[in-house]
Amino acid sequence: MKSLPFPSPSRDLAGDSAQSLLLAARLHAPGSYLGIHSVPGGELVRVFQPYMSRVWLQTSSGFQVMECTHDAGIFEWKGEAVTRPYLLRLEHAETGVIEERYDPYAFPVQISGHDLYLFNEGRLLQAYHMLGTHQVKNQGVTGTRFAVWAPNAERVSVVGDFNHWDGRVCPMMARDHSGVWELFIPDLPGGTLYKYEIRNHSTGEILLKTDPYATRYELRPNNAALTPVESRYEWQDNDWMVQRAGWDWLHAPVNIYELHVGSWKRHPDGSFYSYQELADHLIPYLQEMGYSHVELLPISEHPLDESWGYQVTGYFAATSRYGNPEAFMYFVDKCHQAGIGVILDWVPAHFPQDSFSLARFDGTALYEHEDPRLGYHQDWGTYIFNYGRSEVKSFLLSSAHYWLSVFHIDGLRVDAVASMLYLDYSRKEGEWLPNRFGGRENLDAIDFLRELNTMVHGEFSGALTFAEESTSWPAVSRPTYLGGLGFSMKWNMGWMNDTLNYMQLDPIHRHYHHNELTFNQLYAYTENFILPLSHDEVVHGKKSLLDKMSGDVWQMFANLRLLFTYQMTCPGKKINFMGNEFAQGREWRVNHELDWYLLERDPHRGIQMLLRNLNHLYLDTPALHELDFFTEGFSWIDCHDSEQSVISYQRRARDGSFMLVILNFTPVPRTGYRVGVPESRTYQEVFNSDSTYYGGSNIGNPGDIVPTGQQWSGQVDSIIITLPPLAGIILI
């Protein structure tokens, strides 16, 4: 190919203005200056390589030297038609090393206008396929496509070790008026560190930001993203996924073990278990203990261990603390093969102020509101998402979709829903702005939550959503077409607070607070409730569950056994935080593993054995789970015996089978206690929390319990039993 005389840069397509903008790192449209352009007499190729001493262009005649037209590193070549894409040969100025690579500006953009339109409309539910980084082929060449949303930027560049973190070298292409920037960089290996350098168009502020859509980040405290490595993981959970799709979860047992990966167990040197090690140690434990699901506190990437994962900076990335994405896939897959579902805590309510992440991403309030009365969470020092902005909605919906799709997650526990629903949440008069109707409801957040639940239940059969919602907002777990928010279940914070308040009372005072045990049944079927004893109740000076219990040491353990018996027999699905199951003595400490050594002591082993037996009884007994959400599944036998602090009730299954539960909340054994029964037949005691196996005094009812023929408490017959102290019994 014949080389032609160079035109003056001031007379070609872009001219001096574009050159000056490029060198000042302000070039908004790099494709107008860099790359290949038609000029009189042929084509012009222009590249910017400030760290190279010489550059050659591959032509049909071989590699030809490009002329350095500016000592800052601008090289040009003009000649006849150039093959697309074209290869460059580069000599590094410092080392003299020569390498060959394709020019990023030789390739066209790839993202379709239709996808950009859907993203801007808030209807691109898989935006992670468009934005972020992807290993793709462009004109037959393998490379990494970068795309980021930054509508208020004058210039956005990809920076990393590969270009000396120099924002002048790889400026991105602005995609029309979508606010999206795109660039294809050929031959960039997976695992390459990168960020986006953004120049705000109004202020000129330069920001260095990590990729909001990245799927991998380097290990904290560093925070650069990594280009993706093609996943070769082969899932083995097809049987689970097929079974889940037809799962009747309304009538199924759901018993969740809530877990923080970094503090469940650690190696002797204090290092974390990897995702693979967690699978090897946790799954057998979950099976032995009788849990149907494990819920992980947020494993989305986050910079600070002490945040427990709730201040997320990577909404599409499993944290690198415990391994890579394929390792997390392995964990989920192994759970599924063992019959264990995996639920993730997911945090769409707020995000941290860290300057490298979402906060004022392009120099403006992009993901958050500009007005702090809408956009700043005073309690947590975080920013509140702008749910009314379509692109933010696409971002959050796509994050949920990503976890459920890519990682086969079985459900999302949505954190802090109450803070999303109310504009005046934790705010004084004058610190919040009303909605367009003058009310306190966050209408945009409500619409977002409904869209979230519609998407999850419509696209992921059998997947569940759980709302941590602490107010009396109606119909949280009712379908959106009936005006509800559409969640599968709602945390029953009222039951939790009333129950824990009651259990902390000295038994001598409990008869004055009997309504705290019975009030729950007035609203128990207004929602699909799950009964939580969660991490929030065992930190920040609230004390461990064991330490909350009243009385001396024996009574504290007896009260805890009684609490678990009450929880596991009450209507509603179940969730317990790690450590509760063996009576962790101290509050949860995020930087230490649980106090597993306590299992060397009989009372703690007794609590673990009790909860294991209760869990399996719950899983195996339809009367304890089939009608959790229906009035037909529960009826009081006697809720009025406040003087003796005793309650009794029956749980029923769809086939009419039932169990009787009698709970004594005082340390006084009660002999000759009469209980009404719904059928005149013999009964047996199948569970007693006062058993010596669990550390109790072994007071109970061995053998058959025969009916007396006397009606009682509105029942057709009655039995005479012995009630053990601070204990519950179950009869069939």
Curated annotation (Swiss-Prot):
GO terms for biological process: glycogen biosynthetic process. The active site is at residues 415, 468. GO terms for molecular function: 1,4-alpha-glucan branching enzyme activity; cation binding; hydrolase activity, hydrolyzing O-glycosyl compounds. Pathway: Glycan biosynthesis; glycogen biosynthesis. The keyword Transferase applies. GO terms for cellular component: cytosol. Its EC number is 2.4.1.18. It catalyses: Transfers a segment of a (1->4)-alpha-D-glucan chain to a primary hydroxy group in a similar glucan chain. Keywords: Carbohydrate metabolism, Glycogen biosynthesis, Glycogen metabolism, Glycosyltransferase, Transferase. It comes from the Bacteria. The keyword Glycosyltransferase applies. Belongs to the glycosyl hydrolase 13 family. GlgB subfamily. Catalyzes the formation of the alpha-1,6-glucosidic linkages in glycogen by scission of a 1,4-alpha-linked oligosaccharide from growing alpha-1,4-glucan chains and the subsequent attachment of the oligosaccharide to the alpha-1,6 position. PANTHER family: 1,4-ALPHA-GLUCAN-BRANCHING ENZYME. Monomer. This is 1,4-alpha-glucan branching enzyme GlgB. It comes from Nitrosomonas eutropha (strain DSM 101675 / C91 / Nm57).
